[in-house]
């Protein structure tokens, strides 16, 4: 190849004109470089030569190329300095406000540089950097976020059914621009937030729906309104769902719900007949956009989970079964009446959708338990005189007029009542009256009430009355000098022994009529000396009986103290008789001596 300088031989005549020499040399240089570029095109073919005009950095249009402008054009076409990336990064997808403002190019749109393209090959030197044609630009890598078609395949059917009121412009844009829907799926804000994708929707969204059929005025077509019932689940803490509900606004679903808002009261469906409650289970009836992820449609949430049935609310008034079916209310239930009543209550019972307690029986009648008015008394109360005679001391109705004191549970009688008992005033109630003098022996011998017996120890009282209990009606009256300590103590011991011996037939006692004379012998002697034998009164602290009183009182206190702390052994007879078994639950010989 000839040197470029050899071409200057024909310019001898034009040596003085520099403005002609320089363009000619530049043209020759471009011709030599064009031959070298043809060899590079064999290894790096280009599909299309893009011709454009260059702009001078100073704003002047250049008819010829310059090295500075060629370098700037190549860098702008290969590196794309001033353009944002076509696909949003994963961090940008978390902020819908940023990803929505970015103008996303379509797949079939040619990427145009803001700078003018390089001129044609006949005027510029091409770059040696390999670059694919812009007209065949396509996306082959996977998206960093989940595709809208996959999210749509897992969207609940109730949420898809609510999108029937979308505008035609939204539908056309969804079908035409598949790449735009791939990046930015349509999200609308509604009451139930059912249009959000599964990974952006809160947990309170519904997974089932109810079709409410309402006939038109002319009997024409039937409108199908699908309402999504929100479940009682906790709200999700997904930040993306909150951002989407705040950034997007779609009032189509709100208008659909507001037309029939009166059918919902406090979160419950009202006036829904049983025939109109249907579950949306037919996947073919729901229109879904065409997508390449058809295999995911078979694994929707409605196919994996089954919605709980909802029983319709009966608007008819409750019928009183006692009025409508008087034959069911019977006094003594029979098998047939019980079966009819059970079927009627089982059919008409209100079974709630959610119950905290699960039981095998819904009412007490199914357990065989009847109401209080239907109960039959199988053990009637005995009203015979014998049953009223032997009663407990705690609820006893004694025959003599008496009164109670706070010191103990035994009843007190007055002196006049005792005189009437001695005179036979109560002979129609009692067969015999026994007066027990609990004073010491020297006191009794000094003076006592007529017909009274002296028993001043516990063992003596038990041997006298409980070894061989009397079978006739007897009234026992205890007294001492003042009836404050010795008489009440011995009388309580006698009552406790009688109760223990009759524990197998409680509340019956051998001697239910036990009284204490109020005021004791001293008061009785002062008022009724003629009823004393001998007519005398010897006090317990008499000077002539000091030693005897001290010894007797020590024995009385010792027995009382030991009996409180002494352990009881079966076989040890408290009656001092080998013929009596003192076990409280044994059927001993004393149990045969009953008063009937």
Swiss-Prot record:
Q: Where is this region: Disordered?
A: 174-221
For molecular function, the Gene Ontology terms on record are: phosphoprotein phosphatase activity; protein tyrosine phosphatase activity
- Please tell me whether the keyword Chloroplast is annotated for this protein: no
Stretches assigned to the Rhodanese domain: 429-533
Specify the enzyme's EC class, one word.
hydrolase
Domain of life assignment = Eukaryota
Its recorded reaction(s) are:
O-phospho-L-tyrosyl-[protein] + H2O = L-tyrosyl-[protein] + phosphate
Q: Which residues form the active site?
A: 480
Q: What is its EC number?
A: 3.1.3.48
Q: So what does this one do?
A: Tyrosine protein phosphatase which functions as a dosage-dependent inducer of mitotic and meiotic progression. Directly dephosphorylates cdc2 and stimulates its kinase activity. Required for the G2/M transition of the cell cycle. Required for induction of meiosis II.
Recorded hits in PANTHER family, A to Z, give: M-PHASE INDUCER PHOSPHATASE DUAL SPECIFICITY PHOSPHATASE CDC25, PROTEIN-TYROSINE-PHOSPHATASE
Protein name, please? M-phase inducer phosphatase
Organism equals Schizosaccharomyces pombe (strain 972 / ATCC 24843) (Fission yeast)
Lineage of producing organism: Eukaryota, Fungi, Dikarya, Ascomycota, Taphrinomycotina
Task: Report the gene name.
Answer: cdc25
